[in-house]
Amino acid sequence: MYPKIEHHGGAQGVTGSCHQLWFDSEHSLLVDCGLFQGQEVDDSLPALERLTIDFPTETIQALIVTHVHIDHIGRLPYLLAAGFRGPIICSPPSAHLLPLVIEDALKIGFTRNKSLIERFLKQVKQQLVVLPYKQWHSLIDQKGLAVKVRLQRAGHILGSAYIEVDFNDVSPQDSLTDDVTESKRIVFSGDLGAPWTPLLPAPRSPYRADILVLESTYGDRLHQHRRERSQQLEHLIEQAMACGGHIIIPAFSIGRTQELLYELEHIIHRAEPGSMIKSLEVIVDSPLAAKFTQSYRELKDWWDKEAWRRYRQGRHPLSFDELYTVDGHDEHLQTVDYLSRSQRSTLIIAASGMASGGRIVNYLKAMLGESRHQVLFTGYQAKGTPGADILRYGPQGGWVKLDGEKYTIQASVHQISGYSAHADQKDLINFVKRMRYWPQEIRLVHGDDQAREALKDQFEQLYRESIGFDGQVILAN
């Protein structure tokens, strides 16, 4: 029975997103091809086999990328190695950012051979198809089968999209600008952003969906309001500065780092002259984050109205006087050594966001053992990652393993949920409620069991109270 959806990752967890939509036995579409992280990595397999594409690629007509986070595109090199040569469809900003992410991923997990990397990136760029938002693109148009796709802004990171797929098995040869009422529409949410994500407009719901594949990362909770999270961040900065300590923030290079810089610029801008915060230095110690921040500046045509208003006032939300970047590895080591001895408070942003690697690890090794420092998490911490362990055991004075060694946690540990670039439970429900025609089937993906179960209960109650039946809400597997 078609259409049929097969999940190759990101169904029962929050990493490794990869979904295959089958139109018939010979034609399919792949949505994302992400890397597994944390406990979702199969440690029983050799390292290279964990990433091998274990499904046939011959039927895949295209790969559509919802956004360029590594848990959504990290297996792309292995997909191409498996023989996929079809179009890689993404939004204009994602087309700009994707080669940067893939280059970094290749250097970390595949090879540092420049010639091989350049050859691979050339192949990726040859396959990239840039699809503007809101524009239908015909993927298949043949006798007995017509498929078209459209991207809409998802508000998660710059370039993020949710995907509308119109599938019709009688090939009506309709105009691509018209809706086909007899077609079946499948929507893949990708990662949906919160309504107040800095720099990005809030996502708007689709007109209709017959089947909705919906993320559920925060399906069991509500985020703090933007004003509350900003006040909490400001309070933590003041607390650290009063103690002569540093604020250490593990953050994704793409999206989260830029959101934090945007918020920090505003906090410093509005601070009273002569206040401690006016003298706060902000360090971004991540070459990839620095590259992406520059790309975000270049892609300002995609910013939201608030960001443009600040820019027109002469402010530079992603490039302000108090901001410094650390480039080379030697400079990084010198910075860690200097700051570990310094009493002048600094806010440090470095990857990785779950503290599972990258330069943040050296800062944590140097500073977790001192109570004057603050460690602040602003994003989801997958089970099995050092970030999750620090959050869990830090308040108890426990320890965490970093690079195989135990480090006692004396620093204060905090989490601000409001900085999540993911929609919360209310936002996810509103995404459906604001459709003109609600889905007949909702498949919940990209969430742990607790989050998916809680969201399933909410949707079933919503359908029961609004239209008299539970709806078909499925926990994908």
What does each model-identified segment do?
Residues 2-53, 61-62, 162-168, 172-189, ...:
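Conserved beta-strand hairpin/beta-sheet module of binuclear metal-dependent hydrolase folds
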Residues 11-13, 23-86, 90-128, 194-201, ...:
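Pre-active-site segment of Zn-dependent metallo-hydrolases
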Residues 34-37, 183-189, 216-224, 251, ...:
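Acidic/glycine-enriched edge-of-secondary-structure segments
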Residues 99-160, 300-342:
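Metallo-beta-lactamase
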Residues 234-386, 401:
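Hard-cation-handling environments
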